[in-house]
């Protein structure tokens, strides 16, 4: 289609438009609008598409549709369909006219993202800043992507945060507490555990204006001294001396900061000249770690005219040492994130070392403070200089940016008068500050980082009365800065990126979970976060956190993973189109894992890749095996070509392994963790089967009709759900279940209103690391052990009969829906038919099996999502010899052994019955009872005397517990319990 007249000229030709519009009847316009409506309704949920005006310029007919038309995701096929359909509706006098359909100041074919065009527009400028070296490079990584996001810098933030409200003189959330979360924390549950790692695994440097570490401890080690603790800063001089830098640096002079105080303007920094060979000069920052845990490591330095682009930092941690090269030609005077690592409590368990060795001699390396951990808020606000008393990761961007040394012109446009406005405004201004001085933003001063794109992750408000989905909205802005980026590229590139990301999100949700997921508009509107950044930017409103139908999906970690992967894919597509490269999507995590003994001191680990039905490029090419010995942490990994790995192990220690798949696009998320241990003078070998795969949203309900219009909600006390590793967005139980109660204020949010007693807490979930917990107790009892995933037993590679004892981990496994349910099959059944068959065969051959899980009975007898199967109950009663009595059997987390024919089974035990950061919660354990005369109750819940454990001895032995072994509170209790179980399984003499 020819485009002979630009939109600007058309706007000026208003009178010809009006007169010529009379040549196209209202009836034809209506039919064209209906056609466009039909195209739109295939994809989006918006208002009607209308033809607002018509113009005839020579032999060109131009139709101008309203903005609803611009919300259609235009592709070559539907654009051709539209033009063909509209042409057929035109009167005969227009048969030989060239036809153009305009919306959003563009012909519709120009709104097809460049990434999705079969023929590229070679004249269109792209946004592709060049970079010789990225900000941070992990040089210890065994594999680097070539067709991913390598060398790219992405500015990304999750919405809102805890802030100081001047009008009320209090700290508060920027949104309402609703459906067990608050937007200020909710979007973090996508960004931090899922989206950021995906982008980093693809090679990107991700820059954030909020604290990314949820650890509330923070250690500052600085050349200007430490405010507290015994951390040390040490310089070691080689061939080149350390000198005082000219200018200011960081100093930690106070516990809290008022007004516009800037810690990066209150201290000094150190400099040294680089060498290529000879004796290195080094700085060592040695922190005093308050407690065992994982901590983010940040470094700081100053950027000088002659700065090196390869400053070598080494982080010493529980898993070994990891090296990074930092390009100090950018990013000076703020906190630069290296990675997150495990450290032991105390001083000497870890350190950060900076060397002056470089590829080029005569450059300058600078050294300033190191920050370890996330910490608590330390920015004081209001007349009483009140700090938030919340973890820093809860706070809004405005406060992090002050702590990170960003100029006050960025984080407080209001000069300290309006923190709410400052918080949403500072994010976009911060993007420009990051890019200031680079080719991306050469007109402003800043950190010289060539930012490729910016992304604001929000959720929206709004409700529906019929449990339909509000859905996904994308926002961008094209008019700012005369509609162009600094290199002359059109700001309509933000439309391209918005379309790609929104399309990936909606298409993937529809394909995997909810065919009726709503795609809302793509708004070209002047939202501050979309307008201000001088880089391609999208503001995402993923769903409505106020709408129950949306949040039935939105609280599920599986949904969060899928959405985050879709966002990553959209960014990848967009950036590949800007650089003219082919992209490859990182693989999905591997499965079908097993580790077994081979020879006297070796083990073999095996696994299988997982195909991605939604992405043909996401194929595994190689793998990385990560190793953890004893109570250490995982190493930097070993690159493997095939699907197996053999290695020697030390005797008497638990050795653990996780695997990632890699390809040219990057690295997958990690697999579950399997463990193995060879005991000194081993009494035998135990197979640990990890059957706890579940991650899910909490239980929910809709009251039976006619009450379905009156009551609904989430039921934590029945089933809190299972977070992926940990949950950083949960605030407390829902307390308002009446649908009719409206939002009145953020302090009275109506239907869905929730408590806030957990909003500063990190809640433990499924770590996929339980074979090591079981294995440590097995090893202590004098037995060796190996482990495998449940699917290897179900599909056959691992034979239970090869092991005298089997320990099946079921955790909180139970049949679980996604969202409203009924669209996809239930997942996470405790005992699938193949598993039942494998166990029945094993028991028939005289095996010994230990099974523990919170829903071992409920899932087969009383799962409200599934119809009980007689075959399932028969398996439990006739093979494992137990039957279900009741769910939600206890609340106090205490069990005791009771008199039985089995004297080895003794002791009292406690398990995690409340939400905490160490173990997933067991809020609703099962009471189970003997199903045959040779089976006995051997444990009871202390508060009710309901049966908690059943043991059977006959031709084989079973020990079944209605609560999970790995949730037992202390190592000593677990060792005693496992020893009792294994003694029970000993053959009688």
Set out the residue ranges of the language-model regions.
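Active-site-adjacent mobile loop/cap segments within catalytic or ligand-binding domains
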Residues: 357, 369-377, 453-481, 513-581, ...
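Helical hinge/lid and interdomain linker segments adjacent to catalytic or ligand-binding clefts
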Residues: 726-867
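Short beta-strand-plus-loop segments that form exposed binding edges in beta-rich domains
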Residues: 352-364
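A glycine-rich, often tryptophan-bearing local segment used as a flexible ligand/cofactor-contacting loop or short
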Residues: 812-920, 934-935, 942, 973, ...
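Beta-strand-rich modules
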Residues: 646-667
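A short beta-strand element within beta-rich, extracytoplasmic domains
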Residues: 281-305
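Active-site microenvironments of hydrolase-like enzyme catalytic domains
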Residues: 394-491, 495, 523-546
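Pro/Thr/Ser/Gly-rich low-complexity, intrinsically disordered linker/stalk tracts
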Residues: 574-617, 665-684
């Amino acid at each position: 289609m020819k485009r002979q007249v630009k939109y600007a000229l058309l706007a000026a030709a208003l009178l010809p438009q009006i007169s010529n519009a009379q040549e196209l009847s209202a009836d034809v316009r209506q039919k064209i609008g209906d056609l466009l409506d039909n195209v739109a309704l295939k994809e989006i949920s918006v208002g009607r598409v209308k033809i607002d005006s018509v113009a005839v310029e020579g032999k060109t007919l131009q139709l101008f549709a309203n903005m609803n038309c611009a919300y259609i995701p235009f592709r070559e096929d539907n654009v051709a369909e539209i033009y063909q359909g509209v042409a057929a509706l035109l009167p005969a006098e227009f048969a030989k006219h060239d036809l153009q359909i305009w919306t959003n100041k563009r012909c519709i074919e120009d709104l097809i993202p460049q990434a999705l065009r079969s023929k590229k527009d070679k004249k269109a400028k792209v946004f592709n800043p060049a970079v010789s070296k990225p900000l941070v490079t992990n040089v210890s990584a065994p594999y680097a992507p070539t067709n991913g996001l390598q060398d790219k810098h992405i500015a990304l933030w999750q919405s809102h945060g805890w802030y100081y409200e001047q009008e009320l003189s209090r700290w508060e959330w920027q949104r309402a507490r609703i459906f067990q979360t608050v937007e200020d924390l909710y979007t973090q549950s996508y960004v931090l555990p899922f989206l950021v790692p995906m982008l980093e695994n693809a090679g990107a440097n991700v820059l954030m204006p909020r604290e990314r570490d949820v650890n509330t401890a923070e250690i500052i080690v600085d050349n200007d001294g430490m405010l507290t603790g015994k951390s040390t800063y040490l310089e070691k001089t080689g061939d080149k001396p350390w000198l005082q830098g000219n200018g200011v640096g960081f100093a930690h002079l106070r516990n809290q900061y008022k007004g516009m105080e800037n810690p990066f303007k209150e201290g000094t920094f150190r400099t040294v000249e680089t060498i290529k060979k000879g004796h290195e000069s080094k700085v060592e920052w040695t922190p005093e770690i308050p407690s065992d845990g994982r901590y983010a490591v940040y470094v700081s330095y100053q950027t000088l005219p002659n700065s090196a682009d390869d400053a070598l930092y080494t982080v010493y941690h529980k898993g070994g040492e990891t090296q990074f090269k930092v390009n100090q030609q950018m990013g000076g005077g703020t906190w630069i994130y290296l990675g997150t690592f495990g450290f032991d409590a105390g001083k000497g368990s870890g350190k950060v070392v900076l060397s002056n060795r470089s590829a080029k001699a005569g450059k300058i390396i600078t050294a300033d403070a190191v920050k370890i951990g996330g910490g608590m808020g330390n920015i004081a606000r209001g007349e009483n200089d009140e700090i938030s008393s919340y973890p820093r990761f809860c706070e809004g961007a405005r406060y992090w940016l002050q702590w990170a040394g960003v100029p006050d012109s960025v984080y407080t446009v209001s000069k300290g008068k309006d923190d709410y406005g400052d918080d949403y405004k500072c994010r976009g201004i911060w993007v420009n500050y990051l890019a200031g001085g680079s080719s991306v933003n050469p007109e402003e001063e800043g950190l010289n980082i060539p930012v490729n794109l910016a992304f604001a992750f929000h959720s929206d408000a709004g409700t529906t009365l019929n449990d339909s989905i509000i859905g996904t909205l994308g926002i961008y802005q094209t008019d700012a800065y005369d509609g162009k980026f600094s290199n002359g590229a059109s700001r309509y590139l933000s439309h391209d990126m918005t379309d790609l990301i929104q399309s990936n999100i909606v298409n993937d949700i529809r394909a995997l979970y909810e065919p009726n997921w709503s795609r809302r508009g793509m708004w070209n509107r002047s939202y501050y976060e979309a307008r201000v950044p001088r880089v391609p930017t999208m503001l995402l409103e993923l769903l409505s956190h106020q709408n129950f139908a949306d949040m039935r999906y939105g609280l599920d970690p599986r949904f969060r993973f899928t959405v985050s992967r879709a966002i990553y894919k959209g960014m990848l597509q967009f950036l590949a189109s800007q650089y003219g490269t082919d992209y490859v999507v990182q693989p999905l995590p591997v499965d079908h894992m097993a580790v077994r003994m081979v020879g006297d001191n070796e083990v073999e680990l095996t696994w299988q890749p997982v195909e991605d039905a939604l992405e043909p490029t996401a194929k595994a090419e190689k793998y990385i095996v990560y190793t953890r010995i004893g109570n250490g942490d995982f190493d930097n990994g070993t690159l493997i070509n095939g699907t197996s790995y053999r290695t020697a192990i030390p005797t008497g220690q638990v050795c653990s392994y996780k695997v990632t798949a890699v390809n040219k696009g990057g690295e997958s998320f990690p697999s579950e963790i399997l463990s193995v241990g060879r005991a000194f003078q081993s009494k035998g070998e135990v197979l640990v089967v990890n059957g706890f795969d579940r991650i899910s949203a909490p239980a929910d309900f809709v009251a039976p009709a006619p009450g379905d219009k009156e009551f609904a909600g989430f039921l934590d006390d029945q089933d809190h759900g299972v977070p992926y590793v940990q949950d950083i967005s949960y605030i407390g139980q829902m307390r308002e279940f009446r649908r009719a109660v409206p939002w009145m204020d953020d302090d009275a949010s109506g239907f869905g209103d929730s408590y806030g007693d957990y909003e500063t807490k990190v809640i433990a979930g499924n770590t996929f690391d339980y074979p090591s917990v079981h294995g440590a107790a097995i090893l202590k009892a004098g037995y060796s052990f190996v482990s495998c995933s449940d699917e290897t037993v179900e599909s056959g590679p691992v034979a239970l009969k090869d092991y005298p004892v089997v320990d099946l981990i079921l955790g909180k496994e139970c049949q679980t829906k996604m969202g409203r349910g009924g669209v996809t099959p239930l997942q996470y059944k405790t005992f699938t038919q193949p598993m039942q068959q494998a166990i029945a065969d094993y028991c028939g051959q005289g095996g010994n099996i230990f099974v523990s899980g919170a829903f071992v009975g409920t899932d087969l007898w009383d799962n409200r999502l599934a119809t009980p199967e007689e075959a399932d109950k028969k398996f439990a009663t006739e093979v494992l010899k137990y039957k279900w009595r009741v769910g939600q059997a206890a609340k106090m987390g205490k069990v005791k052994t009771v008199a039985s024919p089995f004297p080895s089974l003794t002791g009292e035990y406690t398990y995690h019955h409340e939400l905490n950061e160490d173990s997933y919660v067991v809020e609703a354990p099962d009471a189970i009872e003997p199903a045959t005369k040779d089976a006995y109750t051997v444990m009871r819940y202390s508060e009710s005397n309901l049966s908690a454990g059943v043991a059977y001895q006959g031709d084989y032995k079973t020990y079944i517990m209605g609560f999970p072994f790995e949730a037992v509170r202390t190592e000593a209790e677990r060792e005693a319990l496992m020893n009792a179980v294994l003694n029970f399984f000993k053959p009688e003499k």
